[in-house]
Each structure stands twice: as structure tokens, then as C-alpha cells.
């Protein structure tokens, strides 16, 4: 099936990415996408944008070059309590809200404590996707996460960039294979994320596809192929 969306990407606003918003959107158009998510890093990542960046996102059109833009953030899960950065006022300004563990701003603990921290973030009604849970930054109980994913409609991401050889994350591929096998077992949708930091990386899932084949993962559980199903599955922004 054809990939029609990628909702985990970064522009120069994140401080360590190298393409503009317009360059990213044009690349998405060239690749035939319908939906592009641009999710700049939350404020605990050094060098990322100031919170005022998110406050002013209303200036950007949500249809550009024929692409639906979803402008949001990759928020940071900060600790084993599941606290994330920014706050509710900002979360409400975002079209899409991803949360993930990053070593630069994560205070972890045991496997059980780490898992509970991610689960607490998943129980946050604003968090729609957990980014790169399989990258090995924190030891996690993937089966426990998958059960909560199914219960809460908080998608677990299969992250392409974390498996790039240059990243030297040796556990990422086996961890992501386990996530796919569990998603298949529990019939739970997943989302593929390029985690693109440059325009040519958009919708690059080349490190994911061998795992998909190995797991014999059903296409109907991959929301990147089904934009309408993806939009319907996402947690809505809670009412005030």
C-alpha cells in the first residue's frame, strides 16, 4: 500500500534540523503525501524553538501545496511520573501532540518505573502518539504499553530514524520488531514515523519495512496508509 502521511518531522525551528517548513511541505507533495505533521521539539531539548513559536502557529495555513499540515510538537516525557513539557494552554494550540523520551531531559528509573512513566503520559488526554518507544533510551515493558495503547488510542510509533546505522542504537530494530509483533497480537494500530530532520527523509520508512515483512504485519494496522482512519483514530483535543 502507498504511504500517504508522515506526522513526525522537524524543521529548522527545532534547532538541529535543516529544512524549512515550506521545503518540508514541498518534499511531502513530491512524495505524494496527503498529510504532513511538523512536530518541533519541546522546550527541554537544547536549541529548540521558544514556546512563543507554538503560540503563533495560527499564522501558518493548514493547507499548503495541496498538503494538509498538522502543526504540533514532540513533547518530552521528563520523568517516571509521566510529566511532559509545555502546559495545557500550549497543548490546546497544537494540531498534533507527540510525547517521547529523550536522553537529554529524561530522569529515568527501573524498567517498571520507566514503563509507568510512559503509561502516565499515555493517559494524558492530550498525548496522541508516543515517539520512538523502541529506541532503547529507557528500558520499557512493551506489552504493557501496547495494552494501554489499545485502551486509550494513544499510538505507539515505529520510528525509522532510530534504526539508522549512524545512530548506533543496536536495540532499536529488535525492540521495534517486538512492538510490531505485539501490535499484531493485540490487533492494535501503529504509526510509522520518519523523524525527518531534513526534507529528503520525509516518509522514509526503509528501516521499518524489513521488520514489517519479518513480522508479517497486517497492512490494515498501519495508519500511514489510511489518512481518514488515522484522523478518526486520533484522540480529539479535550473540551475545556
Language-model features and meaning:
Residues 22-36, 56-63:
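Alpha-helical scaffold segments that flank or form the walls of functional sites
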Residues 155-168:
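His/Asp/Glu-enriched short active-site or ligand-binding loop at hydrolase and phosphoryl-transfer sites
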Residues 41, 188-202:
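Short acidic/histidine-rich active-site segments
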Residues 42, 47-158, 213-222, 229-240:
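Extended substrate/RNA-proximal surfaces in nucleic-acid metabolism proteins
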Residues 34-35, 39, 128:
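Short acidic/polar active-site loop segments enriched in Thr and Asp
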Residues 15-18, 48-51, 139-146, 166-180, ...:
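Histidine/acidic-residue-rich catalytic or RNA/ligand-binding cores of hydrolases
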Amino acid at each position: 500500500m502507498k504511504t500517504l502521511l508522515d506526522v513526525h518531522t522537524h524543521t529548522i525551528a527545532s534547532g538541529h534540523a535543516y529544512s524549512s517548513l515550506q521545503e518540508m511541505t514541498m518534499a511531502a507533495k513530491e512524495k505524494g503525501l496527503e498529510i504532513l505533521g511538523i512536530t518541533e521539539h519541546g522546550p527541554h531539548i537544547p536549541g529548540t524553538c521558544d514556546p512563543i513559536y507554538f503560540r503563533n502557529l495560527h499564522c501558518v495555513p493548514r493547507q499548503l501545496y495541496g498538503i494538509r499540515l498538522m502543526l504540533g510538537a514532540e513533547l518530552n516525557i521528563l520523568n517516571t511520573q509521566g510529566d511532559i513539557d509545555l502546559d495545557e494552554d500550549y497543548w490546546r494550540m497544537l494540531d498534533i501532540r507527540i510525547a517521547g523520551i529523550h536522553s537529554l531531559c529524561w530522569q529515568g528509573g527501573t524498567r517498571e518505573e520507566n514503563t509507568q512513566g510512559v503509561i502516565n503520559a499515555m493517559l494524558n488526554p492530550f498525548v496522541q502518539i508516543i515517539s520512538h518507544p523502541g529506541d532503547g533510551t529507557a528500558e520499557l515493558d512493551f506489552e504493557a504499553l501496547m495494552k494501554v495503547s489499545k485502551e486509550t488510542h494513544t499510538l505507539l510509533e515505529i520510528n525509522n530514524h532510530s534504526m539508522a546505522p549512524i545512530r548506533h542504537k543496536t536495540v532499536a530494530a529488535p525492540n521495534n520488531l517486538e512492538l510490531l509483533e505485539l501490535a499484531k497480537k493485540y490487533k492494535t494500530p501503529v504509526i510509522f514515523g520518519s523523524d525527518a530532520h531534513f526534507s529528503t527523509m520525509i516518509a522514509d520508512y526503509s528501516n521499518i519495512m524489513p521488520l514489517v515483512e519479518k513480522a508479517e504485519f497486517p497492512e490494515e494496522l498501519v495508519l500511514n496508509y489510511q489518512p481518514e482512519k488515522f484522523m478518526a483514530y486520533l484522540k480529539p483535543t479535550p473540551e475545556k
